[in-house]
A protein has these predicted regions:
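Active-/binding-site microenvironments in catalytic and ligand-binding cores
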Residues: 2-233
């Protein structure tokens, strides 16, 4: 959920702008056709109880990878000794945020692709180009239209030096509308490992199709899943 700086909801949401606020639900719909990483568990639903003469309610059972749809990766996802998602401090997942567009930038989003929305070196704390100092959360939009019917094997990813720069600038959380911050066929996962080294948090599979560049309030709280490697947000 995104809000234009000034409010507070729940689900991935962004809010931005002057009153009345614009509110963006940045979670894609989740259903049996939702794209999943090749080999991962897709969404499925079974009814285990149905309203009838002897049952007053409908109850379903869900099966899915926690990486289906908009989600937060836990350190456990890329570090065998890392924290599970239910153990994480929620602070990075709520608060001031900047959305930066890096559309059509190729397979890797590099620092120069974000430079137009970052404070200039050497003093990156000053206002510049109409931007305020960088908030501690950054969402990078890489798609004009996020794929919602098939997995993108050529997904745009973040170069590790881009994550490194954002960490140096004090960012606590990095998010994207791509399915991963690393290329789909990456084995060493250099950007995830940069996230790990700096203790950052990461959001993936966000729906940013209609979200403009600018500063917002982010609300993307993971579930308290005490042994999981990720959580829907």
């Amino acid at each position: 959920m995104l809000q234009p700086t000034d409010t507070t909801p729940r689900q991935p949401v962004l809010t931005c702008g002057p009153m009345p606020h614009t509110l963006w639900d940045i979670s894609p719909p989740i259903h049996s056709g939702s794209p999943v990483f090749p080999g991962d568990t897709p969404y499925s639903q079974q009814w285990v109880a149905s309203i009838g003469p002897t049952c007053p309610v409908n109850v379903s059972a869900l099966t899915l990878s926690p990486h289906v749809g908009a989600h937060a990766d836990a350190p456990l996802h890329y570090d065998p000794a890392g924290q599970a998602v239910g153990e994480l401090d929620l602070t990075p997942f709520i608060g001031p945020c900047r959305v930066i567009h890096a559309l059509g930038c190729g397979p890797l989003v590099r620092p120069e692709h974000l430079a137009h929305a970052l404070p200039p070196a050497p003093d990156r704390t000053r206002h510049s180009h109409g931007w305020h100092p960088l908030p501690p959360r950054v969402l990078v939009r890489v798609y004009a239209r996020m794929p919602q019917t098939a997995f993108d094997t050529a997904l745009p990813a973040l170069a590790p030096e881009t994550v490194e720069l954002l960490a140096e600038l004090g960012v606590l959380l990095v998010g994207t509308d791509s399915a991963s911050i690393d290329p789909a066929d990456s084995q060493p996962l250099p950007s995830h490992q940069t996230i790990r080294r700096h203790g950052l948090r990461v959001l993936e599979n966000l729906l940013l199709d209609n979200v403009p560049e600018g500063d917002c309030e982010l609300i993307a709280l993971p579930l308290k899943l005490m042994s999981a490697d990720a959580s829907p947000v």
